[in-house]
Amino acid sequence: SLVALGFVLIFKASGVFNFAQGAMVLFAALTLVRLMELLKHTFSPFLIALLLTIAVMIALAWVIERLVLRSLVNQPGISLFMATLGISYVLDGFGQAVWGSDVYMLDVGIPKRPIVLLESVVKGGVLVSSEDLVAAVIAGLLVAILGVFFQKTRIGRALRAVADDHQAAQSVGIPLNYIWLVVWSVAGLVALVAGIVWGSKLGVQFSLGLVALKA
């Protein structure tokens, strides 16, 4: 569901399925875990690496908007879809070239032991993975926050207008390039959250990008 939020964000802004979201999850997780290793002697490796990774994902959104999306304004949806496919392959290759292809363990303090719920309702209770429970809670919070963002904020309403009709949105003064920069930045941050949750559960490896298929 965390990966699905990234799909929804891009779809709402462009009406196009973002094939690169899984690659963004992997790239964000790889960047975080490798920066944590490089900063392991600092006072707070996770916090510093997290802030740097956020900056990297926002910079990535800027590069994507400037080099790819800007030239595809008012182009058919299939062109945008093919662009996201290309972005996916570039991110996979770039991530492997920069950070390597090993499997990395990511420990962010999420408990590994399962939790027993509803013992008073079901005999023996229901066994739930702590990591899955944390992921569900985070996904619920993000859905609520993004719902308010799309419905109540000026930028959110502009995003919906852009998704409906790029040309009409531009004709009323909505800056399409800025909107795409915002939505890809937010999608990158959602990918980072998904990468942290799934990376702590499965390890940070190149198959992590396949979690997008579960969305």
Where are these regions (language model features)?
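Short loop segments and helix-boundary regions at transmembrane helix junctions
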Residues: 11-20, 59-104, 149-161, 213
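Peri-membrane helix termini and adjoining interfacial loops of integral membrane proteins
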Residues: 25, 101-117
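Interfacial loop-to-helix junctions that mark the boundaries of transmembrane helices
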Residues: 40-51, 73-75, 120-135, 203-207
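Membrane-embedded helix boundary and interhelical linker motif in transport proteins
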Residues: 13-63, 67
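Helix-loop-helix "hairpin" substructures at the membrane interface of multi-pass membrane proteins
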Residues: 123-205
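Hydrophobic alpha-helical segments embedded in the membrane of multi-pass proteins
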Residues: 1-6, 23, 27, 192-193, ...
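Hydrophobic core segments of alpha-helical transmembrane domains in multi-pass membrane transport
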Residues: 29-33, 54-60, 85-94, 138-147, ...
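Hydrophobic alpha-helical transmembrane segments
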Residues: 23, 27, 46-55, 81-83, ...
